[in-house]
Amino acid sequence: MDTPDSASRVFCGRFLSMVNTDDVNAIILAQKNMLDRFEKTNEMLLNFNNLSSVRLQQMSERFMHHTRTLVDMKRDLDSIFRRIRTLKGKLARQHPEAFSHIPEGSLLEDEDEDPVPPSITTTIATSEQSTGSCDTSPDTASPSFSPGFEDLSHIRPGSPAINGHSQTDDEEETREE
């Protein structure tokens, strides 16, 4: 039934004769070149992704460290301004004639002007606990440990101090004279 000149053989023979082997080889070579390029590109993207991940981790740690530093500085400044307000109040009570021309509202400033809500501090503390990251690089120091800053941790919050001397020290010196 199958003769050598059957229709299927003739069709396949003519179909194969239409395909140029040089063109097929050129297509295969082009596909191999593209595959090599895609593999190199993929490797470069993986390296870039890994490097970006490492840099993100480093920057996140530095950001958290700087955020903690800013929160500490804000807390210190709040304490300083509270002491200044207390000192102003005491001076206003001791020397009312010197403060008579200043309106009462400017002597006792409210803390309502705080632009940073307390929820941000809570968020920072929570994110620090979850990441557990800490930047210990020596090039960035906390302001409380820097040489130019005075350590005020030994002073009670209710006692204002000027240049390391409390107001009560000055009063005792004036009494002795």
Curated annotation (Swiss-Prot):
Region named Disordered: 92-177
InterPro entries per record: KXD1-like, KxDL_dom
Subcellular location field: Lysosome membrane
Biological process terms in GO annotation: lysosome localization; vesicle-mediated transport
Main location: membrane
Record bears the keyword Ion transport: no
Keywords carried by this UniProt record: Acetylation, Lysosome, Membrane
Compositional bias ranges of the Polar residues kind: 119-145
One GO CC term, this protein: lysosomal membrane
Function: As part of the BORC complex may play a role in lysosomes movement and localization at the cell periphery. Associated with the cytosolic face of lysosomes, the BORC complex may recruit ARL8B and couple lysosomes to microtubule plus-end-directed kinesin motor. May also be involved in the biogenesis of lysosome-related organelles such as melanosomes.
Name assigned to this protein: KxDL motif-containing protein 1
Lineage: Eukaryota, Metazoa, Chordata, Craniata, Vertebrata
Gene name for this UniProt entry: Kxd1
